[in-house]
């Protein structure tokens, strides 16, 4: 206990050494000086307090608009919005997940992709890529560049499924319904060929498999 308490006091002392500043002033000064400013968001669009799958959301703004409210930066000063998405979908905790894989394949993706909460260690739910939700995220955030990650996790699968639309109340829709009721929502999939190559060390798009 004494050792843990000593470590705690050491950590507090380190925090007290850090300089305090009005970050909005620093940001404005950097902007006026023509410096490049990079803001990184945490959590996904579907957890946003306003545009997420309420009530299964977080308590803050997780969209690109959060850069404005969090930094004190005016919306018209944002240049590029880079959207980052996984080659498959994940979610922690409760909430709608139309493409969820609650089976051995889902567990395989979880283990290979190390899909566990960074703080709590809770297993993340996994599923096929949902292009309907991705399209929604692109529109809400005003994404100008889109980057995919973790495609290497899916190496070795004979085929992949990608959700391109939903069947909702007897109709096929290509947008997120107002109410994401799992009982009423059925994903429509398109099958794509998989690949066997190991993509771990790939750095160029020309080295990716033809799929």
Tell where the protein language model's regions lie, with residue ranges.
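Non-transmembrane, aqueous-exposed alpha-helical and coiled segments at domain scale
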Residues: 1-211
């Amino acid at each position: 206990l004494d050792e843990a308490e000593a470590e705690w006091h050491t950590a507090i002392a380190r925090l007290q050494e850090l300089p305090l500043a009005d970050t909005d002033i620093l940001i404005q000064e950097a902007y006026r000086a023509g410096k490049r400013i990079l803001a990184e968001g945490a959590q996904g669009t579907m957890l946003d307090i306003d545009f997420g799958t309420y009530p299964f959301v977080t308590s803050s703004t997780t969209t690109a608009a959060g850069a404005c409210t969090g930094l004190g930066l005016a919306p018209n000063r944002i240049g590029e919005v880079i959207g980052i998405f996984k080659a498959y979908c994940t979610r922690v905790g409760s909430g709608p997940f139309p493409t969820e894989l609650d089976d051995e394949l889902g567990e395989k993706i979880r283990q290979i992709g190390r899909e566990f909460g960074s703080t709590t260690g809770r297993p993340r739910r996994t599923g096929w890529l949902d292009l309907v939700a991705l399209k929604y995220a692109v529109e809400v955030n005003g994404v100008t560049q889109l980057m995919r990650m973790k495609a290497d996790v899916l190496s070795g699968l004979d085929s992949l499924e990608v959700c391109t639309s939903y069947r909702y109340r007897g109709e096929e829709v290509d947008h997120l319904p107002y109410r994401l009721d799992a009982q009423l929502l059925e994903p429509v999939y398109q099958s794509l060929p998989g690949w066997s190559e190991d993509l771990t060390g790939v750095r160029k798009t020309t080295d990716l498999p033809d799929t």
